[in-house]
Amino acid sequence: MKRRTFLSGTAGVALSDAASVPIIDTHIHLFDPTRPQGVPWPGKNNAVLYQPALPGRYRGIATPLGITGAIEVECSPWVDDNQWVLDIAAKDTIIVGTVGNLEPGKPEFRKHLERFHRNPLFRGIRYGNLWGRNLGAELSKPEFISD
């Protein structure tokens, strides 16, 4: 297929009824620095982000753009924050799933994964070179791989 053929065939998509196609934002963060324990991210020195980022605020931004739902992606290494997000998502349908934070290779990993995986909104985990972790080093550990 030639580029012009492809472009002419897809040009009408932009003109189609956008409301008939649900738009899901695949990466948002939820956090509330006013919680008693605060948040590990963003830092207090971040004047733009250091304010509650909760579904109501997100809905006000997203709905006028035609966004109908969002997947929350972890922004905390605290295990309890997985449940905090699930509790918020249970109360607001704009959150259609979450990608949590757990550490494969840790003794409690499987217990936590089984617990959170029971909730259909918990879609998986994100693990990378975040929170002082080193994915390259972890990949050489059998317990990390077996989890």
Locate predicted features.
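Active-site gating/metal-coordination segments in enzymes
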Residues: 79-147
